[in-house]
Amino acid sequence: MQTQYLEYLQQLENASHASVPLDEKSEEQPKEEKAQPEPTKIVGKSNPFKSVLTTQQIKLLVECINEAHIFTTTIIPKILSDFFACKLNGVLKSNNNRLLAYLMMQLSCYNYIAYEWQSVIANNKLVLAKIKDKYLTRSDLSSATDNVKCIYPKGYEIIDKYIKQLQKG
């Protein structure tokens, strides 16, 4: 009985395939597209890093970053402000991922920026790796952060000096 039923189902399936004419046009036509909503323009300042850094603190950090040579180029306060707003007109190139991770980790520990800073940098493609010219990923930044927790990177004392100055206000 089961065999007959199985044969019956197979015949139905074969009949349904044979009875449906293939129309080339029907395959190419996309299904009804839903109207894409216009992107909503949000006014105000974007703050993905949840930065609470003041203009004076940004200037101090610029000195720190330039003295420690965290990036391959010298930066100015406008660049760092744009970095924290994820509105860079280009990208920064890391000179030392471990130093960058150490700085960002310290800023996060003292609640100057969000704990999720790695995702913000990766998702917004803000920094290129020094050697491979590819954007730093969350994984790259996570590895660098884990590494600096065990072995301080060369130049960490420069960052610590400026972090202490930040805390003094």
Feature roles, as predicted:
Residues 5-169:
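Flexible coil/loop and intrinsically disordered linker positions at secondary-structure junctions
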